[in-house]
Swiss-Prot record:
Function, in words: Produces ATP from ADP in the presence of a proton gradient across the membrane. The gamma chain is believed to be important in regulating ATPase activity and the flow of protons through the CF(0) complex.
Family of this protein: Belongs to the ATPase gamma chain family.
GO biological process, one term: proton motive force-driven plasma membrane ATP synthesis
The protein's name in its UniProt record: ATP synthase gamma chain
Species this protein is from: Amoebophilus asiaticus (strain 5a2)
Principal location: membrane
MF terms in GO: ATP binding; proton-transporting ATP synthase activity, rotational mechanism
Length: 290
C-alpha cells in the first residue's frame, strides 16, 4: 500500500490536471459558440447559392459550364483533407485519417503517384508525411483565423489545378458538424461539379441574367466553390471545438472520479497508520506496567 505522502502527491497532481482540463473545456466551449454562430449563418447562404448554381447549370448550355462539370476518366486524383492543428480532441483527426486511407484504397487502378493530397491542418500533415503520401501543398494555422480571403486563395489553387487538367477529380474530406458530441466524416465532391437533376416544378424560378448568362456563370461557379470550401472549414472548426469540449469534459469527470478514489485510499491509509500508532502506544504502556 502506498504511503500517505505518495497519495497526497498523487491527489495534488490529479487536481492540477483537472484544473487544466476544466479550463480547456471552457475555452473550447467559447470557441464552439463562435464557430457554431458563423456556421449557422453561412449554411443558408451556401445552400441558397448552391440552389442558384444548380438551376443555372441545368438551364444553361453545356458549353458554358463544361470546364467545371464535365466528367473525366480519372488519371490524377486530388484529395483535400481537413484536420486540426491541435490535438486533445478525441478521435476527430483519427477518423479523418482512417477514412482518407480507406478511400484511397478504393482506387486499385491508380498508382500511388496518381493520388495527391492537399492537407489543411498539422495533425494530418504529420501523419501523411510519415507514411510517404504525395503531398502537393499544405496549409496550417488556417482554422485559427478562418479568413475568407485565405480560403479563397486555396480554392483558386484547386480550381486552377483542375482547369489545367492536372487533376481529373477533386474530393473534400472533413468532419461535418452535428452537435458538440457528434461529428461525421464527410466525403464531398468538389470538382467536377455534379450535374444537378431536373429541378422540381414547385421550385422552378425564372431568372433574368444581367449582363449575360455567360458572365454570370464565369463569376458564380468560382464563388460557389470558394463558399463550399469555406463552409467545409467552418464545419471542421465547429466539429473540432465540439470534440475537444466533449473530450475535456470527460477528462474532467474522470479526474473527479479518480480524486474520490484517491481520497478514500488516503483516509484508509491514514486510519491504518493511526490505528498502528495507538496499538504501539498501548503495547509500550503495557510493557512499562510490567
Amino acid at each position: 500500500m502506498p504511503n500517505i505522502k505518495e497519495i497526497v502527491s498523487r491527489i495534488n497532481s490529479v487536481h492540477s490536471t483537472q484544473q487544466i482540463t476544466k479550463a480547456m473545456k471552457m475555452v473550447a466551449a467559447a470557441k464552439l459558440t463562435k464557430a457554431q454562430h458563423q456556421l449557422l449563418q453561412l449554411r443558408p447562404y451556401a445552400g441558397g447559392l448552391s440552389d442558384i448554381l444548380n438551376h443555372v447549370i441545368y438551364s444553361t448550355e453545356a458549353e458554358l459550364t463544361k470546364h467545371y462539370t464535365q466528367k473525366r476518366t480519372i488519371q490524377r486524383l486530388m484529395l483535400v483533407v481537413i484536420s486540426s492543428d491541435k490535438g486533445l480532441c478525441g478521435s476527430f483527426n483519427a477518423n479523418i485519417i482512417k477514412n482518407t486511407e480507406a478511400y484511397i484504397n478504393q482506387f486499385k487502378d491508380l498508382l500511388p503517384t496518381q493520388i495527391d493530397i492537399l492537407v489543411i491542418g498539422k495533425k494530418a500533415l504529420n501523419f501523411f508525411q510519415k507514411k510517404d503520401y504525395n503531398l502537393i501543398t499544405t496549409y496550417t494555422d488556417l482554422a485559427g483565423q478562418l479568413q475568407f480571403e485565405d480560403i479563397s486563395e486555396v480554392a483558386s489553387f484547386i480550381m486552377d489545378a483542375f482547369l489545367n487538367y492536372t487533376y481529373d477529380r477533386v474530393e473534400l474530406i472533413y468532419n461535418l458538424f452535428g452537435s458538440a458530441a457528434s461529428q461525421f466524416v464527410q466525403l464531398e465532391p468538389f470538382l467536377p461539379i455534379v450535374h444537378p437533376a431536373s429541378p422540381s416544378h414547385n421550385n422552378h424560378v425564372d431568372y433574368i441574367y444581367e449582363p449575360s448568362k455567360a458572365s454570370l456563370v464565369e463569376t458564380l461557379i468560382p464563388m460557389t466553390l470558394k463558399i463550399q470550401l469555406y463552409k467545409a472549414l467552418l464545419e471542421s472548426a465547429a466539429s473540432e471545438h465540439g470534440a475537444r469540449m466533449t473530450t475535456m469534459s470527460k477528462a474532467t469527470d474522470n479526474a473527479e472520479e479518480l480524486l474520490k478514489s484517491l481520497r478514500i485510499t488516503y483516509n484508509k491509509t491514514r486510519q491504518a497508520a493511526i490505528t498502528n500508532e495507538i496499538l504501539e502506544i498501548a503495547a509500550g504502556a503495557e510493557a512499562l506496567s510490567q
